[in-house]
Every structure is written in structure tokens, then in C-alpha cells.
Amino acid sequence: MSIDSLKDKLPDFAKDVRLNLSNIANDDTLGEQTKYGLMLACAVATRNAEVLKAFDQECTPHLAPAARDAALAAATIMAMNNVYYRFVHLASNKAYGTLPAKLRMNIIGNPGVPKTDFELWSLAVSAINGCGMCIDSHEKVLLNADTTQDTIQTAVRFAAIIQSTAVALEAASLPVSAAS
């Protein structure tokens, strides 16, 4: 399965998603590893097996094994961090922010790819998972590393499109309405 096969499965009510999916597939504003690692990390974050399989097939040929592992690690570590830090951020009791997290996250310090790639992937996954504290943290690191706001916006746009693809496929699995 590929991105093209996903597009073929999207119903007419998701025409915009289909067109946006074509746009990111053809987007060349990011480097190859950055782009394909980003798409794979976001696909994992959707928690949709069909989306993950299609993006894995599409992305893996463009990624060294270490880069593929780093993309998978970005989605995985953010699944943990986004829950924890979203809680810390949203809890009325601010004392939680003063407590040690006690979460192992060594992969962030040594991801096996350039730090800016891993940070960009982590930011995009954090956008999917809705953790403002993590978004701010990763954005700060990226901006300090001279990553442009356009690059950050592109990553979040990719995340939004990949997430909407998963939702559209789930919506398309509903039975056809009797009124149709």
C-alpha cells in the first residue's frame, strides 16, 4: 500500500484531504530524510494501521535504517511525553510542574539523526497529540538552531494532513446512510 492507494480509498467527502495528500507527497521544500521521517512519525501518531502501513511503504525506501528508527522513536517518545507534559500544563495544581518527571527519554539526546530532524518530527507529533508545552519546547530548540518558521509550519501542515487522512478513512468505514 502507498500514499496513492490511500488517496484512492478516500471518498468524495474527503476530496480536500485527497488533494492535500497529493500536495505533501509532491512537496520538495524539506530534505528527503526530513520529509520522509516526518511523514512516518506522523503516520505512527495517527494510530491508524492503514495509514501507518501506507506511509511505512512509502517512506522506508527513502530512509536509512537509523533514520527510520528515529522517526518511529520520535512518535513513541512523544506518545509518552505528550500525555505527561499536557497533564503538567493543564493541571490547575502547578506543583506538578515542579516535580521530577522520572521518565526515561535518552533518545531525545541521541536520536541517531540530526537533532533538528528529530525535533521537527517531535514537534509535528506533539501537534497531532495536542501538547502545547511540548510544541513550545520543540519550537524553541528548532528556532535556536536556525530552523525557519516556514519549515516548522510545513511540518505541522504535514501532520494535519496525515491526521485528517486517518480520520477520513475511519469516517469512510461507516455504513452508507439509508437516506443515500
Curated annotation (Swiss-Prot):
Biological role stated in the UniProt entry: Antioxidant protein with alkyl hydroperoxidase activity. Required for the reduction of the AhpC active site cysteine residues and for the regeneration of the AhpC enzyme activity.
Organism: Beijerinckia indica subsp. indica (strain ATCC 9039 / DSM 1715 / NCIMB 8712)
Similarity comment text for this entry: Belongs to the AhpD family.
Signal sequence, renumbered to the chain: none
Pfam families: CMD
Biological process, per Gene Ontology: cell redox homeostasis; response to oxidative stress
Protein name: Alkyl hydroperoxide reductase AhpD
Gene (name only): ahpD
Group of enzyme by EC: oxidoreductase
This enzyme's EC code(s): 1.11.1.28
Top-rank taxon, per record: Bacteria
Reaction equation(s) it catalyzes: N(6)-[(R)-dihydrolipoyl]-L-lysyl-[lipoyl-carrier protein] + a hydroperoxide = N(6)-[(R)-lipoyl]-L-lysyl-[lipoyl-carrier protein] + an alcohol + H2O
Keywords recorded for this protein, A-Z: Antioxidant, Disulfide bond, Oxidoreductase, Peroxidase, Redox-active center
Keyword DNA-binding included in the entry's annotation: no
GO MF, any single term: disulfide oxidoreductase activity
Active site: C131, C134
